[in-house]
Amino acid sequence: MNLNFTSPVHPVPAPRPTSFFIEDILLHKPKPLREVPPEHFAGSLASRVPLLDYGYPLMPAPALLAPHPHPALHKPEHHHHHPYFLTTSGVPVPALFPHHAHAELPGKHCRRRKARTVFSDSQLSGLEKRFEIQRYLSTPERVELATALSLSETQVKTWFQNRRMKHKKQLRKSQDDPIHEENREQSSPEPELPEPAAAEPRKGPPGPFLLQDPEDEVDILEEGDILAAPHRL
């Protein structure tokens, strides 16, 4: 038995010729896109991709083991600065002010230095001459000198402080300089030592028969003279 099953043939609609008339263009309206509610999108995303506790999607093992083309974007510190992140519900939420959220607070402002005072030649000459005469000035003297040189009292006080420090450094450097020490030793004369006095000849002890005084001379008589002496008297 020959059974032939033939499927019904549906007529294929002929394609509508394309027209560039304004009426055809206006009549051809695109179908509106169907809006998907966020709850449906979140549920479908959560059902397809499991999420971790802190909101990042858990990728399959092969994807984790394969080298990522952009490893720098998957560093732990990059997730804090990424403008979009996934919450636990799976909905991407844009971060507000991503570049300013983790900006460091500016440090303390550096104290600006005051502008350095530039003295004229006449002012420097007057200050140097006064410094040679007097190293320390009282308040009335500073006011008087500042008025004479068209300066402020603070400028004169600061200049004298700096000049005293410079003078002390110069003295310390000159004392530590070996050439200066050698010149100072050569310039200072050696003290003259007193000449030793000439030694007087030492007199020996007088002998037993040495007469010191002519009045002490005694006539030595012989034995015959001693016997004949009474007859002379």
From Swiss-Prot:
GO terms for molecular function: DNA-binding transcription factor activity, RNA polymerase II-specific; RNA polymerase II cis-regulatory region sequence-specific DNA binding. Coiled coil: none annotated. One of its GO terms (cellular component) is nucleus. This is Brain-specific homeobox protein homolog. PROSITE patterns: HOMEOBOX_1, HOMEOBOX_2. It comes from Gallus gallus. Residues 164-218 are annotated as: Disordered. Transmembrane segments: none annotated. GO terms for biological process: brain development; cell differentiation; regulation of transcription by RNA polymerase II; stem cell population maintenance. SUPFAM superfamilies: Homeodomain-like.
